[in-house]
Amino acid sequence: MDLSVGKVYTKCFKVAGNLPHCADITRKYCSRYCGILIVDGKFISVKGYMKKIPFLYGIDYLTHDIPTYTMAVSESYRSWFRYFNSLRLLNYPLTAIVCDDNENIAKACLGVYPQAIIQLCQNHFKENIRRSLDLQNDEIHRQFMDEIEDLFRGKRSSEDDFNRVGKRIYQKYADNQLFVAILLQINARKSVLLGYLKGHGIPCTTNLIESFNSHFEGRFKSVKEYQSFHHAQIWINAMIVRRRFKEFTDCEGKFRHLNGKKSFEKSRRPDVDLSTFSDILRDRF
C-alpha cells in the first residue's frame, strides 16, 4: 500500500471536500439553540496573503455548538456583517453576543439583529486597563488594579451595585488623573460591560470560545500555511464539522453534563437522530 505523504494528503483533502458545509448542517438539521452567542475571529496563515486572515465564528452558549462560520480577509465591519447575516439566514435566534472590544463586531451584529444585547468580555477590557498601568513598578497602580478586579469580580446584582463600588473607587483615587480617566471610560462603556443584566444567563467573558481557540490552535500548528483561500475553507469547514460531531471530554462546572455528548446532539431538531445523520455523512464518501 502506497502511504506517501502526497497520497495521504490527497485522500484526506477529498474526504474533507465531500463534507457538507457547516451552515448546511445547521439549516437542515438544527433548531435548538439558546440564542446567546460567544463570537471571535481566529487567524490563520494562507498562501498569497501578507498577513494572517481570520475565520469568524461563534459558539452557542448552552449547546456549545458552532452554527456557522465565515472566512474573511480581515475583521472589518463588512466581514462581521456577512457573518451575522449568514446566521439570520439560518434562522439562528440570536438574543445576545459576548465579544472582545472590536467595535465592528457590535455594530455589525446590531445591523442584522437590532434588538441584540451586547456584552463586552470583561477579561479583555481589564487587560486593556492593565496595559495602561505600570503594575510592575508602581504599588499604587497595583492597588488600583486590585480595586478594578473587585469591581468586575463575578456578576453584580444590579447597575446600582456596580455604581456603588465604582463610586467608592473614584472617591479613593479622585486626585489621580490617570485613574479618574480609566473610571470615566468604565462608566462610558457601562451598557456593554453590564449587558448580562439585560438578559438571563449571559456570560460576561469569552472564556468558552477562548478554549475552542486553543483547541484549534493545536491543529493549526501542524499546518504552517494553507495553500489557498479555497483550501483553507475546506479544511476549516472539516475541522468545525468534526468538532460538532466529537464528544466533549473536558467540560467543567455547570457544563459537566455535556461530557460524553456532541454539540450537534444538543442542537439538532427532535426529529433528527444521530444514526440517520451518520448515514447521510457516509453517503458523501
Residue ranges and their predicted role:
Residues 89, 93-98, 105-231, 247, ...:
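Extended amphipathic alpha-helical interaction segments
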Residues 3-98, 103, 208:
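RNase H-like nuclease fold core
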Residues 10-14, 18-19, 78, 122-132, ...:
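Short alpha-helical interface patches
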Residues 32-36, 147, 255-259:
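Short alpha-helical linear motifs
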Residues 51, 56, 106, 212-213, ...:
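Short, hydrophobic, well-ordered secondary-structure elements
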Residues 7, 207, 211, 234-238:
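Amphipathic alpha-helical interaction segments
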Residues 218-283:
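Basic, amphipathic alpha-helical segments enriched in Lys/Arg and hydrophobic/aromatic residues
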